[in-house]
């Protein structure tokens, strides 16, 4: 499913600020795998995710996803195949748009490659059904702006948006690090449930051993 071979990335090469973030890294995930990478801040975890997502190109090595070489595929094309959650709950959603509009944008983009298509009543009912599974009452607030939600609610919504249409790969980049412990545990439980139910191939990074134990028990 995901195959990375000899990936290397150096920032500011040839200067006093040169930093080798990745060095000949190889990694393989089979379809349906849930793999967690544990490392301290600055260990290159987010650099790896940025390389996979296409935020920049690696200096050396190759990346393939579902049998397709994506090493030099533009970021916007990769985003149709790869879902991603960030540490900051404010990323991944549009605060001035409603919950329903955010879900529609994610759904139409993933399903049709066109975020400006129309959504049907059937689609709206599907959104409400999916929101209900989060157990946060968001199905009754679909007309509310996302900016009114708490950090935990926004992160749960982003998780749902990333998985409405099953992605080839889901990247979880310290996605509970900014949440309080109780909320983080709830979002992790939702993550584990959604990933297992939809059999999503998933790569998560964290520096928190407790969160690692929660997701893999």
Predicted regions, residues:
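Helix-to-loop junction immediately C-terminal to a conserved catalytic motif
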Residues: 53
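Conserved small/polar residues in nucleotide/adenosyl-binding loops
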Residues: 216-217
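ABC ATPase C-loop
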Residues: 162-163
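Conserved ABC transporter NBD signature motif
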Residues: 61-69
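ABC ATPase NBD coupling module
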Residues: 15, 69-83, 91, 113-120
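The feature captures the beta-strand-to-loop junction immediately N-terminal to the Walker
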Residues: 38-40
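H-loop/switch region of ABC-family ATPase nucleotide-binding domains
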Residues: 206-207
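A short, flexible loop at the N-terminus of ABC-type nucleotide-binding domains that lies
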Residues: 1, 10-24, 74
